[in-house]
Amino acid sequence: MRFPRIIISSDRSNSGKTLVTAGLIKVLSKRYKVRGYKVGPDFIDPMYHKIASGHPVINLDLWLMGESGVYSSLAKYGKHFDLGIIEGVMGLYDGLYEDYSTYKLSELTHTPLILVINCSNLSSTVGAIVKGLREYRNANVRGVIFNYIASEKHLDYCKKSIPENVEVLGYLPIDKSLSVPSRHLGLYTTEDFKNAKDVINATANLIEMNVDVDKIVEIAEEANELQESNEIEERNVVGKAYVAYDSAFSFYYDENIDILKKRYDVEFFSPLNNDAPADQPSFIYIGGGYPELHLEELENSTKTKDWIKRNVEKGVKLLAECGGFMFLSNEIINEKSYRMIGLYDIQIKAKDKLTIGYTELETEKDNLLSSKGESIRGHEFHVSKAVSVGDVNFAFKNKHGKGIWNGKDGVYVENSLGSYSHFHFSRTRRLLSF
């Protein structure tokens, strides 16, 4: 299967990869049908790519999905698209180990790399960085884009430093208006950053003026052909799934929603709007996000809270990840206490030190996602913590990662499961048969 594609990488985070990727997708979407991808478990960066392309953006995470899962998703979601633009994670060789890095994904999928280098306070050293990234593991680095260029002289120094076997594809000048605000879990979500579309459009304009987009397409065409995915897309709808989505709960993998659609008709509801859908759900899914920024509204969303608790008590299946798990607790403390759903006898402190990283969980009790004895993988990403735990049952023992309490994760009541871990459903197929 022919699918031209590139990976945008760098030497570190905060290089401008996300905006450059989104701007490039926007420019290329004028001429091609472009699929955006994101290396790693991040939920927020893909939101910007989705605005640029108008299409769902697919995560490619070697820890969560495995090599075969990543390859399959790359091919499956590249079908019927002209180009793939993949944003890397952190620096080129960074990850849990190098085996889970952007470099590893480039090698696995035979996809050429383009580097975005933050040139602030650098000039000729840029060449040393590019040379080092390329030669450290003989990575397929084909080009470089300079970011945050201050002047023509600055640009000239950077250009002259680059090895001859790496194409200088262009640059973006310093423009303080082209920035996305950050907070404790990374960039603002596009739900909360209302200028996201304008910033992406302005970045795209700069790319059109200063970057050789045609050369980028030529490099993308060097990517090896992919083995076409032979996954059979069968739907066997057994009911309706309701997915919480608003500014409090917006951390979802687009592929997870696609997987749910194989078994359910999927609709969305908003706890912040106090929604209580009239139709009977077969499954409720509450993802992560920023509930700690909306505690008063969530405390007052009595219709939604009653609807969720009532349905779980009736045996409806529910999965709650991170922020969703917090919403199911007794209360969340952020200076004062805010009452939540109370399905789980747990008290949460909203703001603590950052917990971030991959998890591996040993299943001690059959649940929505896995059977006893099975190991599943996830990802933690939060600043809250449990400070009091009552009489609750845990489905998982943490082999890797922190979990909720004393090395345990996955609280269950009836057919519900609440965890600090986020999961990728491509590796939790029990969900579709439970």
UniProtKB/Swiss-Prot annotation:
| Cofactor(s), names only, from the UniProt record | Mg(2+)
- Name the SUPFAM superfamilies for this protein: Class I glutamine amidotransferase-like, P-loop containing nucleoside triphosphate hydrolases
Question: What domain of life is recorded for the organism?
Answer: Archaea
Q: Which reaction does it catalyse?
A: cob(II)yrinate + 2 L-glutamine + 2 ATP + 2 H2O = cob(II)yrinate a,c diamide + 2 L-glutamate + 2 ADP + 2 phosphate + 2 H(+)
Q: Name one GO biological process term.
A: cobalamin biosynthetic process
Per UniProt, the keywords (alphabetical) are: ATP-binding, Cobalamin biosynthesis, Glutamine amidotransferase, Ligase, Magnesium, Nucleotide-binding
Residue stretches making up the GATase cobBQ-type domain: 240-430
Q: Where is the active site?
A: 322
Q: State the EC number(s).
A: 6.3.5.11
The pathway noted for it is: Cofactor biosynthesis; adenosylcobalamin biosynthesis; cob(II)yrinate a,c-diamide from sirohydrochlorin (anaerobic route): step 10/10
Any one Gene Ontology molecular-function term assigned to this protein's record: cobyrinic acid a,c-diamide synthase activity
The miscellaneous remark of the record is: The a and c carboxylates of cobyrinate are activated for nucleophilic attack via formation of a phosphorylated intermediate by ATP. CbiA catalyzes first the amidation of the c-carboxylate, and then that of the a-carboxylate.
UniProt similarity note: Belongs to the CobB/CbiA family.
**What does this gene product do?**
Catalyzes the ATP-dependent amidation of the two carboxylate groups at positions a and c of cobyrinate, using either L-glutamine or ammonia as the nitrogen source.
**Protein's recorded name:** Cobyrinate a,c-diamide synthase
